[in-house]
Amino acid sequence: KETGDYDILKEQVDYKNDPALAQPLLDHLKRSFYHVVNNKGPHGLPLIGRADWNDCLNLNCFSRVPGESFQNTASNIAKEVNPETGAPLNEETAESVMIAGMFTYIGPEYVELCRRMGDNAEADKAQAEIDKMKEAIVKYGWDGEWFLRAYDAYGKKVGSNENNEGKIFIEPQGFCVMSDVGGKEFTEKTMASIDKYLGTEHGLVLNNPAFTRYIVEYGEISTYPGGYKENAGIFCHNNAWIMCAAAYAGMGDTAFDYYTRIAPAYQEDEKLHRTEPYVYAQMIAGKDAKRFGEAKNSWLTGTAAWNFVAISQYILGIIPDYDGLKIDPSIPKAWDGYSVSRYFRGATFNIKIENPDHVSKGIKSVTVDGKAIDGNVIKGITSGTHEVVAVMG
């Protein structure tokens, strides 16, 4: 999308760092896609394996010895027995709704790449798998007001209103919203639940309520004190996913509000925040912590990259796309407008966004160097400096 150069998909890339096993990059993407398709659990959702993004949610671990690694899945889970069935547990049961959401969020990009490379048969096949995954999320991954987090090794819900602790987790919510899983109804309920149950003045907590005891079938996440790290801390990395989801849903005020809650430059109480005003922290202590609002582990996070995407592409709406530079903001209604300079595919675009009707989303017109264009994608300009005016409405 950034370069418009599809030849990169033909580049030979090693498997296992072995040049003899090299295949085109597109083949690597295909294998990644079908790794999810071919590794599903009882509900048709992706198996979580050792962990997904949250490496402290160890649903196949069953660590009962202090100091033992939370990644020793193969040796420990085989010793466990399902008390309801008497059968030994295995790694073919615990599923991740987060991975399902990520799959339905990014999978369509693989479909589009296949179409642009002329492989419509593969594109249709992949799209069918995405549709099937969405159906599984709706049927088995929806809890009524938000999306489940997972199913554990016993096949029980994680991140459900049925749980006493850890009723709701942040990770699957944004990806499922941006995938349009369940349509407008699910989106509205999910975003409302995020604000109600995860929202705090210092950011969105990862889960709620916090765990107050060690839960062997959940693993490391339940070992931290409440409000810290993955146990109901404010994990800045995944706050950005909710900013993106809010912007995608046209909730520009909410998206920017969430952005300011964790952005270092907006933190005025340095005695509380205690982290440099120019760097993101991995986490901010959550509402259950003794020092609620104190940032920890600066520089150790993918937050900066995700927040750059959230503010530049989802909120300000300057989006590299396959056919050109797309203008699609989702901003606070009170904004009159703003200006952005963007270098893209050899050209510099000085972009002025005007918001006379004070809306959050929607582009009424776009002009490039005074000439109106159709739609909101600037195409075919590969040199020079150009003045762009986009009017919202």
Give residue spans per PLM region:
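Non-catalytic C-terminal accessory modules of carbohydrate-active enzymes
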Residues: 196-200, 212, 225-231, 244-393
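Juxtamembrane interface elements at the cytosolic ends of transmembrane helices
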Residues: 7, 106-116
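Alpha-helix C-terminal capping/termination sites
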Residues: 2, 115-116, 179-182, 245-248
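Aromatic-rich carbohydrate-recognition surfaces in CAZymes
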Residues: 1-49, 96-100, 104, 187, ...
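Solvent-exposed loop and edge beta-strand segments that line ligand/cofactor-binding
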Residues: 84-100, 156-179, 221-239, 244, ...
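Flexible, glycine/threonine-enriched loop-and-boundary segments that flank and lead into catalytic domains
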Residues: 150-164, 223, 343-354
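Active-site acid/base region of carbohydrate-active enzymes
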Residues: 2-97, 121, 125-154, 191-218, ...
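Heptad-repeat amphipathic alpha-helical coiled-coil interaction surface used
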Residues: 103-104, 111, 123, 130
